[in-house]
Amino acid sequence: MGVRDNRSSCVDVVQPIDNAVRIDLPCAADGLSAVAPDEADTFVIAGMGGDLIARILEAAPWVKDARYEFVLQPMTAVEDLREYLCNNGFQIVTERAVKAQGRVYTVMKAVFTGENTLCDPLFYFVGKLGENLEADELEYITRKRRIIAKLADDIK
């Protein structure tokens, strides 16, 4: 494959299309209700509020098993999701901040350990982002700091 004399060569798309046809994903399902416990071991739940992600996990009791990994990307209510995970036997293994369209979001990997974690209230606001301080993590923490400072001023 290459470009010769300003002409593109043909690309064989048959194999990628055949592979895509074999992927069977449940559609129009409520949360994980259409997923069987043995269907996958890694789940991505993204693009919704942290409170909804917590409700999705709570509604599927079979996810409380150490063999599953969860990649979670809450758009809002991140604090609520972190609190749910800490209080329901999940551990946040790693967490990163990513910037998209001027907003900074978190993406976390969580696993079930069965042990509830006593988390410092500050953990609900910044999670594990302080462990890997790159530009997006610093921006996320700075934004959270402003929110906390404003809340403190409003209380005065």
PLM-predicted stretches and their roles:
Residues S8, V14-A40:
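S-adenosyl-L-methionine
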Residues A34, E39, D51-K156:
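Class I S-adenosyl-L-methionine
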